[in-house]
Design a protein with these regions (language model features):
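Alpha-helical transmembrane segments
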Residues: 15-28
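Feature marks short, highly hydrophobic, charge-poor N-terminal signal-anchor/signal peptide-like helices
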Residues: 2-10
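Cys/His-rich metal-chelating microdomains
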Residues: 132-133, 243, 364-365
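Periplasmic c-type cytochrome electron-transfer domains
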Residues: 32-33, 37-128, 132, 138-141, ...
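A cross-kingdom feature marking solvent-exposed beta-strand/loop segments within repeated
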Residues: 137, 143-150, 175-178, 246-255, ...
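C-terminal functional regions that serve as terminal interaction/effector modules
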Residues: 290-293, 356, 360-436
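Extracytoplasmic
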Residues: 146-148, 186, 251, 291, ...
Length: 436
């Protein structure tokens, strides 16, 4: 009843407005008749056309308003787009992506760690709509309008820089979201690296990249013992960080085994609150309860570090065995000169640059340290270098002490970042007790 009254009022208002305009035009025409005779038929006809066009535009505007407010226009996804509408929207989207991606610099995308990092998030965040080599057409997503494309088929139509723009910014009116953390271009490029490999992956290769190697029950028993993995570890954490906490042997995923539980819990909390930016970790952490976070932190903290023979034997296969189709981009940890220079920075700092010693907060040290400071010994050099770079850019949040690292990172040169991260990577992750 209320809608009917609204329609009647709109119709009456529109009719009244049109009649008023017609009368106004008639008066104007009458008052200017003598002048029009002097100007001749050409001027009179031109003025009449102006009046007619103005009246038409006004009527069209009111008609459009009436059409929209009446609710007659269907918005149901089940009706699909008309063919001409679908073509126009697709054409406009493609031209926009091409234009806005101009000038984008594409980094190297062949690192297997980068590809695997994108693959694990694709499995969690993209596969339900876009499918995969082992899951062709998601039934629910196909009822969207427009339906999400099956990416293994359409990715070859796009350049890397265009894929970057789409993944980072999303697409309006399609259900395609923007990347949850706009500060993390490195994560977006990881997704692009994976997408470029996706069309040529077999179902088995996809499973291995996205979910890692399957671990036998005997290995799980040997690895965990009384420290049974919490449910959240199996559901969310293990596909990237492994049940052994070794990051699947890939620098794209940090080593969690032996890390300090206070730091792990604080990091998960920071991700969940959006205080540490990551389009990969934020959605996962946001779905965890505080109890889940504590259990995850306790589980990984109680695992032996990767320098332990038990952990090395039980861990997943290294990156070189994942697939011969991909080439890694690993740095040699045995660069003795870089490690020695890094040791000097870590243990003594650089007074001339007002750089404090890294060991004061991160070890190695025989004195107790703040338990919220992370342990770095044995961590992947590439992962540490990425975190320092993010701190430099102001794109890395974290625990309440994260602001201290922004200042330190801003004073490190690229060469010093290389050296100090190689030094920490060369150390065993059990150099000191996680409690210190």
């Amino acid at each position: 009843m209320q809608r009917f009254r609204s329609l009647v009022l709109i119709a009456a208002f529109s009719a009244g407005a049109v009649l008023a305009l017609v009368r106004l035009f008639e008066r104007a025409a009458t008052s200017g008749r003598s002048a029009q005779k002097q100007r001749g038929n050409q001027g009179r006809n031109a003025k009449r056309w102006v009046f007619k066009i103005a009246a038409f535009l006004l009527v069209a505007a009111f008609g459009g308003l009436l059409f929209v407010t009446s609710g007659i226009m269907p918005i149901k996804a089940s009706s699909r787009h008309w063919a001409i509408t679908a073509w126009f929207l697709n054409f406009a989207m493609r031209r926009s992506v091409v234009t806005h991606s101009l000038g984008t610099r594409v980094p190297a995308l062949d690192d297997v760690a980068l590809v695997a990092k994108g693959a694990t998030h694709y499995e969690f965040g993209c596969r339900p709509c876009h499918g995969s080599p082992d899951f062709a057409q998601p039934a629910i997503a196909q009822q969207m309008t427009p339906p999400p494309p099956h990416l293994p088929w359409v990715v070859p139509q796009w350049q890397a820089k265009e894929l970057f723009y789409i993944v980072k910014h999303g697409v309006k009116f399609t259900g395609m979201p923007a990347w949850p953390a706009q500060q993390r271009d490195d994560e977006v490029w990881a997704m692009v690296a994976f997408l470029q490999k996706l069309p040529n992956l077999t179902p088995e290769q996809y499973q291995e990249l996205a979910r890692g190697k399957k671990v036998s029950g005997a290995v799980i028993d040997e690895l965990s013992g009384p420290n049974n993995p919490p449910q959240a570890v199996g559901e969310s954490c293990a596909r990237c960080h492994g049940l052994d906490g070794g990051g699947r042997g890939l620098s794209g995923f940090p080593i969690l085994a032996g890390q300090r539980p206070t730091y792990l819990f604080a990091s998960l909390l920071a991700y969940a609150r959006g205080e540490r930016h990551s389009g990969i970790m934020q959605p996962i952490a946001a779905g965890l309860s505080a109890q889940d976070m504590r259990e995850i932190a306790r589980y990984y903290a109680n695992l032996a570090g990767l320098s332990s023979p038990r952990a090395v034997g039980a861990g997943l296969k290294p990156a070189s065995t994942i697939s011969s189709s991909f080439s890694g981009n690993r740095h040699d940890r045995r660069d003795a000169s870089a490690i020695e220079r890094g040791r000097e920075i870590a243990m003594r700092g650089m007074p001339s640059q007002r750089l404090p010693a890294c060991a004061a907060c991160h070890g190695p040290s025989s004195t107790p340290r703040n338990p919220i400071y992370p342990q770095l010994a044995g961590q992947y050099a590439e992962y540490l270098a990425l975190q320092i770079t993010l701190f430099k850019k102001g794109s890395r949040g974290g625990t309440p002490y994260a602001h201290l690292m922004r200042l330190v990172a801003s004073r490190l040169t690229p060469e010093q970042v290389h050296d100090v991260t190689r030094y920490y990577a060369s150390l065993g992750s059990t150099t000191e007790s996680p409690a210190q």
